[in-house]
From Swiss-Prot:
Protein family according to the UniProt entry: Belongs to the bacterial ribosomal protein bL33 family.
Gene from which this protein is expressed: rpmG
GO biological process, any: translation
Species annotation: Polynucleobacter asymbioticus (strain DSM 18221 / CIP 109841 / QLW-P1DMWA-1) (Polynucleobacter necessarius subsp. asymbioticus)
UniProt cross-references to PROSITE patterns, sorted A to Z: RIBOSOMAL_L33 (PS00582)
Annotated protein name in UniProt: Large ribosomal subunit protein bL33
Keywords from the UniProt entry: Ribonucleoprotein, Ribosomal protein
Region (Disordered): 1-29
Entries under NCBIfam families matching the protein: PRK00595.1, rpmG_bact
Annotated Polar residues bias: 14-24
InterPro entries for this protein: Ribosomal_bL33, Ribosomal_bL33_CS, Ribosomal_bL33_sf, Ribosomal_zn-bd
One GO MF term attached to the UniProt entry: structural constituent of ribosome
One GO cellular component term noted in the UniProt record for this chain: cytosolic large ribosomal subunit
One Pfam family recorded for the sequence: Ribosomal_L33
Comp. bias regions, Basic and acidic residues: 1-11
Length: 55
């Protein structure tokens, strides 16, 4: 059986609103931290979302 290569992560808003998205990524192919521009509905703007650990 194959190992589960994908790990669940949390993308947290850099605007400090507390809003976050959850997603998964392959740790083997992308070991660096993920940073994406996504929509923050709290402030109604696109902001940078940075990867944090999902607890």
């Amino acid at each position: 059986m194959a190992k589960g290569g994908r790990e669940k992560i949390k993308l947290e808003s850099s605007a400090g609103t507390g809003h976050f998205y959850t997603t998964s990524k392959n740790k083997r192919t992308k070991p660096e931290k993920m940073e994406l521009m996504k929509y923050d509905p709290t402030i109604r703007k696109h902001v940078a979302y940075k990867e944090t650990k999902l607890k």
